[in-house]
Every structure is written in structure tokens, then in C-alpha cells.
């Protein structure tokens, strides 16, 4: 619901934060989103680097260079991003950390702490209170920020639709999944202590096995998680690729969201490989997109965001 009315959307993942050209073309990006009737943008409000990061990284990529140094210029640019989104009438989902090493992510948090950053080492991010404290500091800094351009606190800004704790969280062991459940509960509750205006999403990748599905349900059933979110890339280990498999995937997630968790369903990322040109497995790629959206909204899905939208490339 938005303003007392049902809110459903087609949106896009966009990257106005990481890179010189991407930052320079922020206004163009939101103009294009508006023209293409894409009403929600998912943006990564993250970027972690080493204290000896290059000047270019500091100027165009990072939110932090080491655990002690916050890059104010990046926060100023995030102010600009939200202003341009507001002008374009686009709502924003801000993702606050990354499971992967792109722009730092969980591996960089672990390196800051002198911990193993690969494979099973990721469990430490959810287990180590020092990692919790570093992430909470970033969350508090973003959610409580007052825009230099609008003088609106982010926690009060209606341009923001939701906070997403992580991009594509994955964990391989039962102990790690239990630790992540506690972490999601802690961080979602932390945001809700000073922001009662916005939705909070967990940011899990999804599931392909029964054990992962049970954990997915447990995380999304937490009181302070407001909607179910899953990513959809059938070619990446989520089953054999066919239109029927696409329908089965969407029907399963819709049933889980509506009948078990009883929360709205958002497909936070979806896409189909482009290495076969305009066709994918014998069908036009446009047909795959159309069928995904048709089935998702037929199932009363709340929204879906394509990966990735680059109108000027």
C-alpha cells in the first residue's frame, strides 16, 4: 500500500554511484527512467575500500576507505541522486551492503577485521560483533543523514521506498544461516528504532534447495522485514531453463509470500543472458520479460526490477 492505495511497480536496478561517467549522468538516468515509466530504482548505497585506496576510488566509488574514513563527497552525491529521483517521481530502494566483493562488500568488512574473506569466512560477518558494529555505523550514517540539498532527513524522505540490508546474501551452513537470521533481525530492528516511515528488506539471493527454502521463510517471517524479496536468474543454478520453469519459479515464490509468510513479493533482480543476442533459448528476450511480468503480476506480485538498466550505453 502507498498512500492508502495498492502499489505495484516495474522498476530497474541502476548504478549512479560507482564510476565517473555514471555519477556525471545521474540526471540523464532519472530522466530516462521517467520516460520509460519505471517507477522504482534499486541503488547500492555501499562501497568499502582499504585505507590506501586510490584517489579515483575515493572520488568515484567508495563510501569508506577503511573502517575509520568516511567519504563525505560520496554522501553528497547520494543527496544528489535522491534529489534527481524525487524530481523524476521515482521511488528508491537503497541497498546497504553487498554479499560479493564488488565495491568492497562483506569481504572488505572482514579484511578490515583481519579475518578470512572468502568462502566459509563469510560466516564471521554474521557472527562477529565487531562486524555488526561496523555495519550498524554505516546504516546509522545513511538512514539518519540530512540531505545537503533538501534538508530532509533520509528517514523522513518519501523518495525512499525501502532499505535493503544486503545484496544477495548467501550462506552455506546451518550455523551460518542461524547467525544470519539473528543478524537480519538485529539490523532490521535497529533501522526501525529511528525510521518508522520506510520498508525494510532482508536482501537474500533466494533458494534452490529445500533447506534454503526453510531459512528463506524464517528470515522473511521476521516482524521487522516488510516484504519477501527474491532474485530470478534461471540460468544461474535455479533450475533448467524453460518458460514452464519460469512459471514454476514465480508460482512457488508467490505461494510462499502470500500463503506462508503473508507479505508482498518483490523480484528484486531479474534478467536473461544476452550472449545469444536478441533471442534467448530460441525465443525473443522480450518474450521472456513479458512472460515474467505477466505471470508475476497475475500472481499479485508487488513489483519487479530488471537487471540492469543502462539507457546511455
Indicate where each model-derived feature is located.
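Short acidic/histidine-rich active-site segments
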Residues: 267-269
Amino acid at each position: 500500500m502507498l498512500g492508502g492505495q495498492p502499489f505495484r511497480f516495474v522498476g530497474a536496478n541502476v548504478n549512479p554511484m560507482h564510476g565517473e561517467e555514471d555519477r556525471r549522468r545521474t540526471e540523464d538516468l532519472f530522466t530516462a527512467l521517467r520516460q520509460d515509466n519505471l517507477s522504482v530504482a534499486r541503488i547500492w548505497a555501499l562501497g568499502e575500500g582499504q585505507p590506501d585506496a586510490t584517489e579515483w576510488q575515493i572520488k568515484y566509488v567508495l563510501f569508506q576507505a577503511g573502517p575509520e574514513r568516511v567519504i563525505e563527497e560520496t554522501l553528497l552525491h547520494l543527496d544528489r541522486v535522491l534529489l534527481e529521483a524525487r524530481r523524476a517521481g521515482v521511488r528508491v530502494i537503497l541497498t546497504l551492503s553487498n554479499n560479493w566483493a564488488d565495491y568492497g562488500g562483506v569481504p572488505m568488512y572482514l579484511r578490515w577485521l583481519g579475518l578470512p574473506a572468502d568462502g566459509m569466512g563469510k560466516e564471521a560477518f554474521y557472527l562477529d560483533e565487531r562486524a555488526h558494529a561496523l555495519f550498524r555505523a554505516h546504516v546509522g550514517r545513511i538512514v539518519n543523514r540530512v540531505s545537503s540539498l533538501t534538508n530532509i532527513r533520509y528517514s523522513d524522505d518519501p523518495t525512499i521506498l525501502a532499505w535493503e540490508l544486503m545484496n544477495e546474501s548467501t550462506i552455506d551452513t546451518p550455523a551460518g544461516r542461524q547467525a544470519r537470521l539473528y543478524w537480519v533481525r538485529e539490523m532490521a530492528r535497529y533501522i526501525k528504532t529511528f525510521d518508522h516511515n520506510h520498508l525494510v528488506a532482508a536482501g537474500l539471493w533466494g533458494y534452490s534447495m529445500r533447506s534454503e527454502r526453510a531459512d528463506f521463510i524464517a528470515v522473511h517471517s521476521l516482524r521487522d522485514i516488510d516484504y519477501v524479496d527474491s532474485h530470478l536468474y534461471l540460468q544461474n543454478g535455479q533450475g533448467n531453463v524453460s518458460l514452464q520453469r519460469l512459471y514454476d519459479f514465480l508460482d512457488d515464490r508467490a505461494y510462499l509470500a502470500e500463503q506462508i509468510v503473508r507479505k508482498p513479493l518483490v523480484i528484486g533482480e531479474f534478467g536473461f543472458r544476452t550472449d545469444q543476442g536478441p533471442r534467448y533459448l530460441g525465443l525473443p528476450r522480450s518474450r521472456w520479460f513479458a512472460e515474467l511480468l505477466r505471470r508475476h503480476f497475475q500472481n499479485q506480485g508487488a513489483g519487479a526490477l530488471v537487471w540492469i538498466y543502462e539507457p546511455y550505453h
